[in-house]
Amino acid sequence: MGNIHFVYLLISCLYYSGCSGVNEEERLINDLLIVNKYNKHVRPVKHNNEVVNIALSLTLSNLISLKETDETLTSNVWMDHAWYDHRLTWNASEYSDISILRLPPELVWIPDIVLQNNNDGQYHVAYFCNVLVRPNGYVTWLPPAIFRSSCPINVLYFPFDWQNCSLKFTALNYDANEITMDLMTDTIDGKDYPIEWIIIDPEAFTENGEWEIIHKPAKKNIYPDKFPNGTNYQDVTFYLIIRRKPLFYVINFITPCVLISFLASLAFYLPAESGEKMSTAISVLLAQAVFLLLTSQRLPETALAVPLIGKYLMFIMSLVTGVIVNCGIVLNFHFRTPSTHVLSTRVKQIFLEKLPRILHMSRADESEQPDWQNDLKLRRSSSVGYISKAQEYFNIKSRSELMFEKQSERHGLVPRVTPRIGFGNNNENIAASDQLHDEIKSGIDSTNYIVKQIKEKNAYDEEVGNWNLVGQTIDRLSMFIITPVMVLGTIFIFVMGNFNHPPAKPFEGDPFDYSSDHPRCA
């Protein structure tokens, strides 16, 4: 207020002093403001029922950023105001043909138009530049501003999303019965066309690296029922329909996330003996949790929708959790033994016969085993027969013949025929039999014990191998279920984002595109 009084005082002194330093512009300012007793607090109308028409346009010089977490759009704009003030008219010929006059905004009436949906409490422009006045009273005011407007974020298809942000301007102290807010017009071939779009100067505009502008319409809105008293409520809204450029998120989020997700399939190929099946799956799960945390830090805390990448991470984390559960089951079956568990016939039929054939698991049949394994089994199975034959042979042969049978044949001696036990004197047969049994009984018992242990060991190993095969079958079955689901789910989720396109027209149901290429006459 002190500056205004100083300006008035300076003008008055210059005018009334009569000094030669007074030029025509100073005289004009004095006539308009002092002599005519200009009151900047009064609307520029001749009658109280008249309405002041304010024309607005917006020039965008830079789309600075869109902070999703704060839901704030920061833009650098030039806000153009235009109106007529009959009190600021003059005859240019009387003032050395002055065609334009520049005045501080503190000296004249200006419409108190503010950004309604601001997000930082700054309603007005950042810099109050001079107003331009023409002899016919046409006043223009083009202040620059950096607006931080509220922009509701739709996170449903993040990072393949598009947003509809707006800058809504309204009069702070006047209603629609006192001033009207309209879009500025442009004259082309003698016709007036309203500027129903945000003006962008290609030479002065700085393109944003993350967002691409699709539509930039402007529209006047009237709300006659906004207030109970019927006072019309109006605003002029400039819309920015922008689409995200997803390259940053594809390179830094999606690609590493997908690659790490498919590392969970390695858990199916690792043998249970390695001890790394469970740790591999858990490492993948922790990596996905980190990606989910990073994503949540870039999005607003909203319960209206789940972002696309969030859906993918939750989907993958569910599958990886299934892999971890599968690893636990497989390890449980792998380390089972006959001493702790019994393998039922039903389990053998399902996991050792039916499922391996369906899953194309290679398991050699007994008929396809190598010859040395068949010979070993044949020798093991016929050990008892050999022992019984040896016992019969020892009953027939005497000890001397057994010891010197080959030597006697080389020296031409004829082997003595030993009578069968059971012929001759019974007492002699019994004595001979007892003598033979006493000498070889311990050897036969030892051999039978060895055979028994071998059979038990073979049966034990076979049972353990069957439990291992059951675990491998479950592992293979889970791999054939989880891996295709992971691949198809990944494709389906990200294909959804590919079909999320901005609308062809700015407003649904309105065929007009609100662009400078297709203006419509007022």
Curated annotation (Swiss-Prot):
It is a multi-pass membrane protein. Keywords: Cell membrane, Disulfide bond, Glycoprotein, Ion channel, Ion transport, Ligand-gated ion channel, Membrane, Phosphoprotein, Postsynaptic cell membrane, Receptor, Signal, Synapse, Transmembrane, Transmembrane helix, Transport. The keyword Acetylation does not apply. InterPro entries: Neur_chan_lig-bd, Neur_chan_lig-bd_sf, Neur_channel, Neuro-gated_channel_TM_sf, Neuro_actylchol_rec, Neurotrans-gated_channel_TM, Neurotransmitter_ion_chnl_CS, Nicotinic_acetylcholine_rcpt. The modification Phosphotyrosine is found at residue 393. GO terms for cellular component: postsynaptic membrane. Pfam families: Neur_chan_LBD (PF02931), Neur_chan_memb (PF02932). One of its GO terms (molecular function) is acetylcholine-gated monoatomic cation-selective channel activity. Residues 22-245 are extracellular. Gene3D superfamilies: Neurotransmitter-gated ion-channel ligand-binding domain (2.70.170.10), Neurotransmitter-gated ion-channel transmembrane domain (1.20.58.390). Disulfide bonds join 151-165. The chain crosses the membrane at residues 246-270, 278-295, 312-333, 477-497. It catalyses: K(+)(in) = K(+)(out); Na(+)(in) = Na(+)(out). Residues 334-476 are cytoplasmic. Belongs to the ligand-gated ion channel (TC 1.A.9) family. Acetylcholine receptor (TC 1.A.9.1) subfamily. This is Acetylcholine receptor subunit delta. It comes from Tetronarce californica. The lineage of its organism: Eukaryota, Metazoa, Chordata, Craniata, Vertebrata.
